[in-house]
Amino acid sequence: MSKKLRNFLVRIIVAAFASFAVMAIPPYHHNTVLAKTVSVNQTYGEYKDYYTVIGESNIDQSAFPKIYKTTERVYKGQGTSEKRVTVSDVVYNPLDGYKRSTGAYGVVTKDMIDMSKGYREKWETNPEPSGWFRFYNRADNEEISEKEYDSRRTKSYKVTNNVPVVLTTLKGKKYNSHLFVASHLFADSLGGKSIRKNAITGTQMQNVGTRKGGMQYIEKKVLSHITKNPDVYVFYSAIPEYQGAELLARSVLVSALSSDGVINETVRVFNTADGFNINYEKGGLLTESPVSEIDNIEDSTTDEIENSVDDSEEIVYNDTTTEEEEN
């Protein structure tokens, strides 16, 4: 069998597996670090901080990258610092047949945290995760997939799903913003990269919850424990959970196991926002917004992505959307 034919068959198999839906949340196990399926019938209302602890990590340490010593310059691939650092490589699984991120995992060390402190890596070119855009033919405005868009960019266009909404701070102040951010799977504060394979289209609430919720619950727990105990390292993985062929993850399964055993848990972080009806199938919100003008085309949302992430720690959500938002 030729290499070309073999690669073609592999792509078909990957896409086929991605299309199957499981109608109930599967029991958690950590034999593989891959995207998982999750039920569309979940009830999230009881999880006001957008996460729940579901058990121990069940992490197989032998499946994780090894810790090693190198220089900061070599590890970061830039700069001139020859400082010796103890690190691990972070593994970013490839996008699946629907161009969705499928997981990231690695071992977090004190040096990885220190190198990330006070520094935000710029996002790679075209980092927007699945569900961020919708794609259309220019000739007839027929909706197409991202793969089809990639194959004929001069004859198609894309429209952002991330429409403006009204959000509310913990102090009750309302302001205009966007509901979605490019949410890191492996947190940049823990050494994760700002690349598409390490991001999902997540709500601001999924990203930070309230002051203690969302992805920040487990991220801050790991960061704090390592900062206080510099010799400790943490096995860490984040796996998005999709329903069938939906482009937006319903949740993210995050597991953490510290070398001293103090941290040993798996949390499910919900990609939801009370008061908003999210379109998980295609991205955006479930409101009527037919495509009528190509003037709405948005070729880059990098600023939106960069400015939305850690600056929103105090953001909570509206209990209801306004009439203006619905229209």
UniProtKB/Swiss-Prot annotation:
Listed EC numbers: 3.1.21.1
Q: Which UniProt keywords apply?
A: Endonuclease, Hydrolase, Nuclease, Signal, Virulence
One MF term in GO for this entry? Answer: metal ion binding
The record's annotation in InterPro entries points to: DNA/RNA_non-sp_Endonuclease_sf (IPR044929), Endo_G_ENPP1-like_dom (IPR001604), Endonuclea_NS_2 (IPR044927)
> Which Pfam families does this entry report, sorted A to Z?
Endonuclea_NS_2 (PF13930)
Q: Does the keyword Membrane feature in the UniProt annotation?
A: no
**Per the record, which residues fall in region Disordered?**
299-327
Signal peptide start and end residues: 1-24
At the top of the EC hierarchy, this enzyme's class is hydrolase
Its catalytic activity?
A: Endonucleolytic cleavage to 5'-phosphodinucleotide and 5'-phosphooligonucleotide end-products
Q: What does this protein do?
A: May have a role in S.equisimilis virulence.
Q: Give the protein's recorded name.
A: Deoxyribonuclease
Q: Which organism is it from?
A: Streptococcus dysgalactiae subsp. equisimilis (Streptococcus equisimilis)
